Amino acid sequence: MSVSPVSIVSTPVAVSASPAGAPDQPVQPVTVRWRGREAYEASFDAMRAFTDTRTADTGDEIWVVEHPPVYTLGQAGDPAHLLVADSGVPLVKVDRGGQITYHGPGQIVVYLLLDLRRRKLMVRALVTKIEEAVIETLAAYNLASVRKAGAPGIYVASGVHEGAKIAALGLKIRNGCSYHGLSLNVKMDLRPFLAINPCGYAGLETVDMASLEVAADWNDVAHTLVGRLIANLDGASAAADKPHALEQSND
């Protein structure tokens, strides 16, 4: 997978009006950074540093990456959910919510570095917007998917793989700002999921778009997903999908 580094800027919009009726200041545009294939630890360190050093004036960013094979275990995760100790895939303990998951080639990983206070956005509302973006993205490829109460992520709605997980979600909120994010399986080697209880659920089937007979290009799906995320987050049109919305970046 090869991705040219670009920065996509969404349209700034006012999120609400003040009690006196005067419009609030518009939310700053979201910058989208395409980081290509990157070691998990490098992304993890970078998003923590970004969050630790951001100020009230720092713009929000979305990072899109693809990782080499790695298991990540959430802050309160149980190591017992890694069923095969000598799988050859490294395990990294991280500070997001949730249990254990797998990242690898052929999977889109999106990190959301957002100032929730500035956006006047509660965590539950953010999760809903992310899940809606994934559902809308899959629908663009004629795949029906759903949420599950109490189990963040997105699941296949019907058919032979009904109930299988196709996208995972895990966030960390620090000082009113989010990092970590979501992963969507496009076309990947799914065998490493057999060595874990995905997200802490024993026997949970994990699939990708290819398993559902959709031959989708990683870049195309990633651009669709980013467009839906931006549209859901700030109310802008999904201009992020369109070539005129792309600007070259030095990232």
Swiss-Prot record:
One of its GO terms (molecular function) is lipoyl(octanoyl) transferase activity. PROSITE patterns: BPL_LPL_CATALYTIC, LIPB. It catalyses: octanoyl-[ACP] + L-lysyl-[protein] = N(6)-octanoyl-L-lysyl-[protein] + holo-[ACP] + H(+). The record marks K165 as: Lowers pKa of active site Cys. Substrate binds at R96, G97, G98, Q99, I100, T101, Y102, H103, A168, L169, G170, G181, L182, S183. It is an enzyme of class 2 (transferase). Residues 56-241 form the BPL/LPL catalytic domain. Disulfide bonds: none annotated. Keywords: Acyltransferase, Cytoplasm, Transferase. Its EC number is 2.3.1.181. One of its GO terms (cellular component) is cytoplasm. One of its GO terms (biological process) is protein modification process. Catalyzes the transfer of endogenously produced octanoic acid from octanoyl-acyl-carrier-protein onto the lipoyl domains of lipoate-dependent enzymes. Lipoyl-ACP can also act as a substrate although octanoyl-ACP is likely to be the physiological substrate. This is Octanoyltransferase.
